[in-house]
Regions:
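Conserved small/polar residues in nucleotide/adenosyl-binding loops
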Residues: 1-5
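Soluble catalytic regions of membrane-associated enzymes that act on cell-envelope
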Residues: 6-298
């Protein structure tokens, strides 16, 4: 992991992160490393603006007043439309198991479901910039590029400027995959990781590979969300449907096997969401919250 991604964990803004990185170690580490990006210019900026511009400015017609609802974004590890019988009923027409996401399928039918929403990233490290900042994937993951410390206007920062509390949850170790560092640079104030979970609930729920099992970590996240000042924005990255595709012993015989090893893990995470909703649906903050579910990559 590039050291600049960790610097933002210890700085209140990206400018101070750059100051942290202005030290002899970083100079020696990067001498001769290259990495310069050649910006080819095939058109003059004015000419290109006349052909196409990626800049879109909001107008009053398409802008609704901010209602101050809480927003929770679940970024789901290795999730795919093919796991859902609601999205792909033809895959399960002649099979005993009707998909591996029955709870998420029920939410799709009760809420808004976007059936043609595609990721152009292939790794978890590319997910948060895309989901929280609308930043596309490049050959080099954005969080490893020098541009990651450039000023950006991303959803958490926009909402924080509107008075929202902001939080990010991931059951992996603090600093893993640059998630926490990126979340901090995107404007998120509160970070919750494996260490925070274990400080309260002990170490029995570590999966032995990546972090805390999804079910107990989602329950913990709900506890922390209940204590956040409203309105709040929270993003949560799940883990349990990642390779090597294991589930807790208590669920080994309770979940469908599927055609591949990850299907049982997907079913486990789906059940973890079901239990999260069952526990917190009666809370006042829950009824004032918009929940968004999105996969991390293709």
């Amino acid at each position: 992991m590039c050291i600049r991604d960790s610097a933002t964990l210890y700085a209140s803004d990206n400018a101070r992160a750059n100051l942290i990185l202005s030290n002899p170690f970083c100079i020696l580490r990067t001498v001769g490393s290259g990495g310069k990006i050649n910006y080819e210019r095939y058109f003059a900026p004015e000419e290109l603006d006349g052909i196409y511009t990626p800049v879109h400015c909001p107008d009053s017609v398409g802008t609704a007043p901010l209602e101050g609802r809480n927003v929770v974004v679940f970024v789901m590890e290795s999730m795919s439309a093919e796991h859902s019988a609601h999205l792909h009923p033809e895959l399960y027409a002649d099979r005993q198991v009707k998909g591996y996401t029955p709870f998420l399928d029920s939410l799709m039918q009760a809420g808004y479901c976007f059936e043609r929403m595609y990721a152009n990233g292939t790794r978890s490290i590319q997910a948060l910039p895309a989901v929280l900042g609308s930043i596309p994937s490049f050959k080099t993951p954005f969080v490893l590029m020098p541009q990651a410390l450039a000023p950006t206007r991303q959803l958490p920062r926009i909402l924080r400027d509107k008075g929202y509390a902001t939080a990010f949850f991931c059951g992996s170790a603090a600093g893993s995959m640059g998630f926490g560092a990126y979340a901090r640079s995107a404007g998120i104030e509160r970070l919750y990781s494996r260490e925070d979970y274990e400080a309260r609930h002990g170490r029995d729920d570590f999966d032995g590979y990546w972090g805390i099992w999804d079910e107990p970590f989602l329950q913990y996240a709900g506890e922390e969300m209940s204590a956040l000042p409203e309105p709040f924005f929270a993003a949560l990255f799940t883990l349990s449907s990642h390779h090597p595709f294991v589930v807790p012993d208590a669920y080994r015989d309770l979940l469908p096997e599927g055609l591949t090893r990850n299907h049982k893990c997907v079913a486990y995470t789906d059940n973890a969401f079901r239990r999260f909703f069952a526990r917190y649906a009666g809370e006042e903050w829950f009824r004032r919250t918009v929940f968004v579910f999105v996969a991390d990559h293709v």
